[in-house]
Amino acid sequence: MGLLRIMMPPKLQLLAVVAFAVAMLFLENQIQKLEESRAKLERAIARHEVREIEQRHTMDGPRQDAAVDEEEDIVIIYNRVPKTASTSFTNIAYDLCAKNRYHVLHINTTKNNPVMSLQDQVRFVKNITTWNEMKPGFYHGHISYLDFAKFGVKKKPIYINVIRDPIERLVSYYYFLRFGDDYRPGLRRRKQGDKKTFDECVAEGGSDCAPEKLWLQIPFFCGHSSECWNVGSRWAMDQAKYNLINEYFLVGVTEELEDFIMLLEAALPRFFRGATDLYRTGKKSHLRKTTEKKLPTKQTIAKLQQSDIWKMENEFYEFALEQFQFIRAHAVREKDGDLYILAQNFFYEKIYPKSN
């Protein structure tokens, strides 16, 4: 290459560089078009599958037994926060759905927007509550919490979620955008080609690693109110805490994912029977691993921890962790280094009037 440069006149060298740059831009544009076409095809296939189910429902008539069996009339919503081991957990649900007889559906929003329009909120609530063919149903997607009660529904879905240490989540997401993961290694990522480390980004004050990027887990739990997405809002954090306690069945943490799965299996065996063994022994137990990820230095972590945004997100994480560990402490016992689910610990007595 060096010899060719010496032999080529300067004008030809310039033309060669320009031609190469144009070719690269053209190639990137074609790749982008292919990815957009693939996404459109996936959406078309999904719509076709939904139409087929609805047509079968129309031909066969509505299910008469939908309200009879309470165990079948269950919907779980996992409004998954990005980069919290959500793919690993979701794949357990997919692996168990045929065996445990329930449906799994991915909520695919345009450009992964976690906030739905008002009209889409109405459609979503109606779909979830009346689509009896998909019950029992496990819905998952990157959407913020939606309060079904304000839409007047009689039976609300069961919300679950998993959160992660805020800085670890941001670091994982930073490298994921650049290098992807081992789940779909060939897929081109939005920031592919950017070799800058997370440490370098923080040192330079880059936008992709700014403290504002930490603000995600709080708004996901806070919901669809505008204040939820106001970065650094104390009201948003208080609302997120309220929802976590009052509206979520169980919220686990990435760092203790196996215990989260164990508790779900004990409490909701209709969906999660066999989940713990599958997580421990299955080939998908740690399905998605971000590639090329480099741990940040202590200096980088210390700099992020000076931010009020980190302090709030970390307070919320610690709040969720404390609640999860409280629930676990009352549900399991440790023996020889292993955890065991407690058997039923209540019974009924002094039942009157006495039967003859």
Swiss-Prot record:
Enzyme Commission number(s) from the entry: 2.8.2.-
Keywords: Coiled coil, Disulfide bond, Glycoprotein, Golgi apparatus, Membrane, Signal-anchor, Transferase, Transmembrane, Transmembrane helix
UniProt-listed InterPro entries: Heparan_SO4_2-O-STrfase, P-loop_NTPase, Sulfotransferase
Gene3D superfamilies from the UniProt entry: P-loop containing nucleotide triphosphate hydrolases
Outcome after substituting R288 to A/T: Severely abrogates catalytic activity but does not affect 3'-phosphoadenylyl sulfate substrate binding; may be involved in polysaccharide substrate binding specificity
Its job: Catalyzes the transfer of a sulfo group from 3'-phospho-5'-adenylyl sulfate (PAPS) to the 2-OH position of iduronic acid (IdoA) or glucuronic acid (GlcA) within the heparan sulfate (HS) chain and participates in HS biosynthesis. Required for metanephric development of kidney formation, suggesting that 2-O-sulfation within HS is essential for signaling between ureteric bud and metanephric mesenchyme.
Residue ranges annotated as Cytoplasmic topological domain: 1-11
Record-annotated disulphide pairs: C201-C209, C222-C228
GO MF assignments: 3'-phosphoadenosine 5'-phosphosulfate binding; heparan sulfate 2-sulfotransferase activity
Compartment list: Golgi apparatus membrane
Post-translational modification: N-glycosylated.
Species in which this protein is naturally found: Cricetulus griseus
Impact reported for R188A: No effect on catalytic activity
Protein name in UniProt: Heparan sulfate 2-O-sulfotransferase 1
Outcome of substituting R80A: Severe reduction of catalytic activity but no effect on 3'-phosphoadenylyl sulfate substrate binding; probably disrupts binding to the carboxyl group of the iduronic acid of the polysaccharide substrate
Residues at which adenosine 3',5'-bisphosphate binds: K83, T84, A85, S86, T87, S88, R164, S172, Y279, S285, T290, K293
